[in-house]
């Protein structure tokens, strides 16, 4: 029997990752896997309360990072680790790579500080697979403008998203064993075929 896996979806706002999350969850369920779908910040009652604060309240950049990791610690303890222990597959819309990208890249917070928090909060847990949906900034912005009211991160300027995207790509280069980069400008059907192949290799 295939060991339960932890899969994360990453990308700048407007990259389209959330569109494909349910597709991957359905693929796994079709192969008789129990699947837990969650998100960050969020996933628990405390995490969802912190999400509202993080997405809408102004704060010091270090406060923002600390709250992200506080929500993550609760998420791991209350949802992710218990699910994996049960043998359930976990799919999370964002995880620690997002904090490195947004707070480290976009906000320019010292990467070493984030690494210390990462080692404290989850020294042994890393995703088995990280799907990074990559897209040019102008495409991402057009998608955001066409969808909904924007939160404080989505309202950031182009240089913030350029730095965030660059940090995502740096993380992918640093951890190539778990990252798969998806060109999110492709047709949905093309992306889903790629996802089907990737998941087939992970969940035979």
Curated annotation (Swiss-Prot):
Q: Which GO terms describe its molecular function?
A: ATP binding; dTMP kinase activity
Keywords from the named record:
ATP-binding, Kinase, Nucleotide biosynthesis, Nucleotide-binding, Transferase
Reactions that this protein is recorded to catalyse: dTMP + ATP = dTDP + ADP
InterPro entries with a match to the protein in the record: P-loop_NTPase, Thymidylate_kin-like_dom, Thymidylate_kinase
UniProt keyword Transferase present: yes
Q: Which GO terms describe its biological process?
A: dTDP biosynthetic process; dTTP biosynthetic process; dUDP biosynthetic process
The enzyme class is: transferase
Q: EC annotation?
A: 2.7.4.9
Asked if the keyword 4Fe-4S belongs to this entry, the reply reads no
Among Pfam families, the record links this protein to:
Thymidylate_kin
Q: Name one GO cellular component term.
A: cytosol
Q: What biological function has been recorded for the protein in this entry?
A: Phosphorylation of dTMP to form dTDP in both de novo and salvage pathways of dTTP synthesis.
NCBIfam families xref list? DTMP_kinase
Which family is it part of? Belongs to the thymidylate kinase family.
Q: What is this protein called?
A: Thymidylate kinase
Look up and give the organism this protein is from.
Herminiimonas arsenicoxydans
């Amino acid at each position: 029997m295939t060991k339960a896996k932890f899969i994360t979806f990453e990308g700048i706002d407007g990259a389209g990752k959330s569109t494909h999350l349910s597709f991957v969850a359905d693929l796994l369920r079709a192969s008789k896997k129990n699947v837990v779908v969650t998100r960050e910040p969020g996933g628990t009652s405390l995490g969802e309360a912190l999400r509202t604060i993080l997405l809408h309240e102004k704060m010091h950049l270090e406060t923002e990072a600390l709250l992200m990791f506080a929500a993550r610690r609760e998420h791991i303890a209350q949802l992710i680790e218990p699910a994996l222990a049960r043998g359930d597959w976990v799919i999370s819309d964002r995880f620690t790579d997002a904090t490195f990208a947004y707070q480290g890249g976009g906000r320019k917070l010292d990467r070493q500080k984030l690494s210390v928090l990462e080692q404290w909060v989850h020294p042994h847990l890393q995703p088995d697979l990280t799907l990074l949906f990559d897209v040019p900034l102008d495409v991402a912005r057009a998608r955001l403008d066409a969808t909904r009211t924007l939160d404080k991160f989505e309202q950031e300027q182009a240089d913030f998203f350029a730095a965030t995207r660059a940090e995502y790509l740096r993380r992918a280069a640093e951890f190539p064993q778990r990252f798969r980069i998806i060109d999110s400008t492709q047709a949905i059907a093309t992306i889903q075929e790629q996802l089907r192949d990737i998941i087939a290799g992970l969940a035979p």
